[in-house]
Amino acid sequence: MSVRLVLAKGREKSLLRRHPWVFSGAVARMEGKASLGETIDIVDHQGKWLARGAYSPASQIRARVWTFDPSESIDIAFFSRRLQQAQKWRDWLAQKDGLDSYRLIAGESDGLPGITIDRFGNFLVLQLLSAGAEYQRAALVSALQTLYPECAIYDRSDVAVRKKEGMELTLGLVTGELPPALLPIEEHGMKLLVDIQHGHKTGYYLDQRDSRLATRRYVENKRVLNCFSYTGGFAVSALMGGCSQVVSVDTSQEALDIARQNVELNKLDLSKAEFVRDDVFKLLRTYRDRGEKFDVIVMDPPKFVENKSQLMGACRGYKDINMLAIQLLNEGGILLTFSCSGLMTSDLFQKIIADAAIDAGRDVQFIEQFRQAADHPVIATYPEGLYLKGFACRVM
């Protein structure tokens, strides 16, 4: 008999709506013993079967659902089915947009909670973010090896969130050959170098692909400031869009060096690109104090908020940095501003931008809205999957 997680009375509603998480407060008791990440059955207070998921005793998310089908076992065949289903959509996108790199698995939205897989050419970069994902590592890797024999697999599960579920961070080659120090990929006509082994996340922010492309329509003959530039994807896109100058700012010299290489790789005019190692908040104030002006500003900061207790502070941070950006824009200038914090709703982010404009003494029009690229889908029953939001704003 399998181990069962029994829900408290009335706490089954979210599962009946096929939400993939069971929170600790919804649990009445466990029947049997399960190890960290082990597969368990989830039942209501009367014992009616609801779902099958991965158990995590130390997490507020006590179980993550693998399947709502009682006949489905969690094994190699299960992971193969999920991977093949996800690949169909990515195949269409890759062909339509000419991509050689994309997010293959987007966690819960692809029916594989806690699992992220990005494909860069013939390298699969794996992140296992939950106890259940780690428990199923061998089955997942076996399915990947069968379906993608041409691909090497590299583990980038060096993510702090693993510690919340009692797991160590892991990093390194799983199968195949080691990725090169910098792997070239293609995106909307750009060639970009990706550092799989040491870069942010899995090496590159694939979720901003469509936003980078959209930037081109605003930048012709314009002076652009690219904040939190990382390896320069927005900068390269701005140069391809015909900007007169782009200034990229980041605290990492390594990232700025790759950004410079990306400009050179695309045979763009390096004299139009400036790379500044500095703190963005500090530099924006310096620019304001000396009267610098820009026509377009890209504001793509890292996540400011990890949990609800940090939300108020994050709101202040987002408001301050966008206020400074608005002050630096010429009349009619464009602010492209983003938040990748899942707890930051689109409505709240829009209000923060409005408040920033008031504090800056400027009027702002919202002219375009952004979200994560289409290879990062959001399943209807899991709205938390929509984490990236952004706006194009015209400053009056």
UniProtKB/Swiss-Prot annotation:
<dbReference type="InterPro" id="IPR002478">
    <property type="entry name" value="PUA"/>
</dbReference>
<keyword id="KW-0698">rRNA processing</keyword>
<dbReference type="GO" id="GO:0003723">
    <property type="term" value="F:RNA binding"/>
</dbReference>
<dbReference type="InterPro" id="IPR036974">
    <property type="entry name" value="PUA_sf"/>
</dbReference>
<keyword id="KW-0489">Methyltransferase</keyword>
<dbReference type="Pfam" id="PF17785">
    <property type="entry name" value="PUA_3"/>
</dbReference>
<dbReference type="InterPro" id="IPR015947">
    <property type="entry name" value="PUA-like_sf"/>
</dbReference>
<dbReference type="InterPro" id="IPR029063">
    <property type="entry name" value="SAM-dependent_MTases_sf"/>
</dbReference>
<protein>
    <recommendedName>
        <fullName>Ribosomal RNA large subunit methyltransferase I</fullName>
        <ecNumber>2.1.1.191</ecNumber>
    </recommendedName>
</protein>
<keyword id="KW-0694">RNA-binding</keyword>
<keyword id="KW-0949">S-adenosyl-L-methionine</keyword>
<dbReference type="Pfam" id="PF10672">
    <property type="entry name" value="Methyltrans_SAM"/>
</dbReference>
<keyword id="KW-0808">Transferase</keyword>
<dbReference type="GO" id="GO:0005737">
    <property type="term" value="C:cytoplasm"/>
</dbReference>
<dbReference type="InterPro" id="IPR023542">
    <property type="entry name" value="RLMI"/>
</dbReference>
<feature type="domain" description="PUA">
    <location>
        <begin position="2"/>
        <end position="81"/>
    </location>
</feature>
<dbReference type="InterPro" id="IPR041532">
    <property type="entry name" value="RlmI-like_PUA"/>
</dbReference>
<dbReference type="InterPro" id="IPR019614">
    <property type="entry name" value="SAM-dep_methyl-trfase"/>
</dbReference>
<comment type="similarity">
    <text>Belongs to the methyltransferase superfamily. RlmI family.</text>
</comment>
<comment type="function">
    <text>Specifically methylates the cytosine at position 1962 (m5C1962) of 23S rRNA.</text>
</comment>
<dbReference type="GO" id="GO:0016434">
    <property type="term" value="F:rRNA (cytosine) methyltransferase activity"/>
</dbReference>
<keyword id="KW-0963">Cytoplasm</keyword>
